[in-house]
């Protein structure tokens, strides 16, 4: 009965509104444009309507809306639309928070937070971030612990590697000491030479315990060696270890004993500025290191540093050098360094002197830069003692600060100059470094007392190099050897002659009157000859200008008949009377092109002492084709490059020809 009464009462309330007509605003609520005060009654009436309706009827309508007729459903739908519009209007105006919240929930719009909800939201966010930060801290702490553990492991591994490296260095040093300490040469900047032996490695306090050295093993224990003092004394000790690392031992090393000599260890003078460099000796056999006491007569190094005695037994299985390879090459200390090398044979073991195969000196010469450089040593003056460096670059200015000019003699530095910092060399410019007390045009600076003047070397065997701070050779200059050529001296088209006068002791049978005709000195004879040439020559006589080389070449092709009437240029006039000279001048052929000397071997030559009356006189032999070293003579040489104050010309150096040592 209840559902029916409920339906009837609802029809009574809704029936006054016809179909398609909007219900009254007092019953259904105010439209969008109505004032706000009329919304509340409609809401209260609708609330009363819903509250007055029994619960069972409303639940039935919600659960079974199909039971309602279409007209009623349409009215309810329109009513709900009006309510939604009213709620939207209320939310937009903001006068009713409840309407706004309902509209936000219905329309799906996020609700606006107030101050309390905002604080709560922020607190939640802070708590969330705090938890995340705490988790990140825990993770970072774990990673830190893992990294610390890895660091400890790496440090331990590093210590192990350092220990192994130190052990390896000690073993290498022992191998060096066992194989090549005897004869190891140290050369310092001052030129001093020291020979290092195994005694140098030992501390002076350890010599009292020399009796306790074991007779087997490496020769002396590692704990007896002061490695720090060795490193300070020889800083370049381990720099040449790669030289010995390539040589593998084919046989196990035999047991050896190092016996220290009673003469004592080598004395060392330690200086702070002393730089020592190692010289690498070519090892013929690293598996055995037998040594005998060197002979002091054939080994000057042993005299310098004291004889060092070592004993050992040669290896029977090694035959690296034969007896023909055991040679002695003695060198002076000023030029070359004597180096001791061992040559082993199956029958004997000797310490001999051998020269270097790769290194000729302990000083290792820097290598030339293969890429080249724009810097070049333009000139090295041996007379003025200066070095000139030019910058061949077109646009690059080079800083020469720290660059070194070195002069090497036999690959050993004898002179060195370092450019000061800030020395700039512009492109296409040069810089000249002068030595002290050498130039005649430069003003000399006073030299401090007790200090040697700085001078560059001028020997022809000196090599000048320019080295950068990294040790690379940028330029190299060496004077070309000067070869004296006899043909180059007499190419100035001047009258040249070598006047030969046999000395008095070589001709004891010469007539006294003829000796009076000879000139008293070469100077007078040359002066007379010069005066005679200024006069007008007689008929049929020509003055010829020739050179020594042309005369020598022509003398080889002439026939004996052509040299019959050829007279000497100067000696014939001095030794023969004036009448005979005129007779000979008339007999000279006019077609003679060159004046050549008389060849003594020619049987048909003209007798110089035979005049028109048939009288036989002394024959003067003038030899110009070759120098007769068995005949005492006085020779005068002439050229136009120099002249004395007496008007006498002389050569700056003797003429050297290829026929000097040949006898024709």
From Swiss-Prot:
Residue spans crossing the bilayer: none
Coiled-coil parts of chain: 118-169
Compositional bias per record (Polar residues), positions renumbered to this chain: 245-260, 312-325
Residues covered by the LTD domain: 362-481
InterPro entries recorded: Lamin_tail_dom, Lamin_tail_dom_sf, Lamin_tail_domain
Bias-annotated ranges (Basic residues): 533-547
Name used for this protein in its record: Lamin tail domain-containing protein 2
Organism, scientific name: Mus musculus
């Amino acid at each position: 009965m209840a559902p029916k009464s409920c339906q009837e009462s609802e029809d009574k309330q809704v029936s006054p509104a016809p179909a398609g007509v909007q219900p009254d605003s007092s019953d259904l609520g105010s439209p969008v444009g109505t004032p706000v005060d009329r919304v509340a009654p409609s809401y209260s009436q609708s609330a009363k309507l819903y509250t007055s309706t029994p619960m069972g009827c409303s639940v039935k309508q919600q659960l079974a809306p199909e039971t309602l007729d279409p007209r009623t459903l349409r009215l309810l739908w329109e009513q709900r639309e009006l309510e939604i519009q009213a709620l939207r209007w209320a939310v937009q105006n903001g006068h009713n928070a409840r309407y706004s919240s309902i509209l936000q929930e219905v329309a799906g719009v996020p609700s606006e937070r107030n101050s309390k909800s905002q604080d709560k939201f922020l607190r939640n966010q802070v708590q969330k971030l705090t938890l995340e930060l705490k988790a990140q801290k825990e993770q970072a702490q774990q990673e830190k612990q893992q990294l610390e553990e890895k660091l400890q492991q790496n440090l331990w591994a590093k210590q192990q590697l350092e220990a192994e490296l130190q052990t390896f260095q000690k073993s290498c040093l022992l191998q060096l000491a066992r194989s090549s300490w005897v004869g190891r040469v140290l050369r310092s900047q001052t030129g001093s030479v020291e020979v290092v032996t195994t005694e140098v490695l030992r501390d002076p306090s350890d010599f009292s315990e020399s009796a306790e050295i074991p007779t087997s093993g490496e020769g002396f224990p590692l704990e007896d060696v002061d490695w720090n003092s060795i490193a300070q004394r020889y800083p370049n000790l381990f720099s040449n270890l790669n030289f010995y690392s390539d040589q593998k031992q084919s046989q196990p090393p035999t047991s050896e004993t190092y016996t220290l000599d009673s003469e004592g260890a080598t004395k060392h003078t330690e200086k702070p500025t002393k730089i020592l460099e190692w010289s690498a000796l070519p090892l013929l056999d690293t598996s055995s290191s037998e040594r005998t006491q060197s002979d002091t007569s054939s080994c000057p190094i042993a005299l310098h540093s004291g004889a060092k005695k070592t004993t050992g037994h040669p290896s029977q299985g090694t035959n690296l050098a034969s007896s023909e390879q055991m040679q002695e090459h003695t060198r002076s200390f000023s030029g070359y360094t004597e180096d001791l090398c061992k040559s082993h044979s199956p029958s004997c073991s000797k310490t001999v002197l051998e020269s270097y195969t790769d290194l000729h000196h302990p000083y290792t010469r820097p290598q030339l830069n293969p890429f080249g450089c724009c810097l070049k040593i333009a000139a090295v003056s041996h007379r003025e003692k200066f070095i000139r460096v030019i910058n061949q670059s077109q646009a690059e200015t080079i800083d020469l600060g720290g660059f070194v000019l070195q002069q090497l003699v036999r690959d050993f530095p004898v002179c060195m100059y370092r450019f000061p910092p800030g020395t700039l060399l512009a492109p296409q410019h040069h810089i000249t470094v002068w030595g002290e007390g050498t130039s005649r045009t430069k003003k000399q600076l006073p030299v401090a007392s007790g200090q040697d003047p700085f001078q560059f070397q001028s020997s022809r065997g000196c090599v000048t190099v320019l080295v950068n701070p990294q040790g690379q050779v940028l330029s190299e200059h060496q004077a070309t050897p000067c070869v004296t050529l006899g043909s180059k001296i007499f190419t100035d088209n001047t009258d040249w002659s070598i006047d030969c006068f046999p000395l008095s002791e070589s001709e004891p049978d010469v007539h006294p009157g003829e000796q009076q005709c000879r000139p008293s000195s070469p100077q007078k004879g040359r002066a007379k000859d010069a005066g005679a040439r200024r006069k007008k020559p007689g008929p049929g006589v020509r003055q010829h200008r020739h050179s020594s080389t042309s005369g020598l070449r022509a003398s080889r092709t002439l026939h004996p008949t052509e040299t019959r009437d050829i007279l000497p240029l100067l000696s014939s006039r001095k030794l023969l009377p004036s009448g005979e000279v005129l007779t000979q001048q008339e007999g000279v052929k006019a077609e003679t092109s060159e004046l050549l000397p008389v060849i003594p071997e020619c049987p048909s030559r003209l007798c110089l002492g035979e005049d028109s009356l048939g009288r036989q006189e002394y024959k003067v032999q003038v030899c110009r084709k070759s120098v007769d070293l068995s005949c005492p003579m006085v020779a005068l040489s002439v050229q136009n490059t120099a002249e004395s104050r007496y008007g006498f010309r002389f050569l700056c150096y003797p003429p050297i020809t290829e026929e000097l040592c040949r006898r024709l």
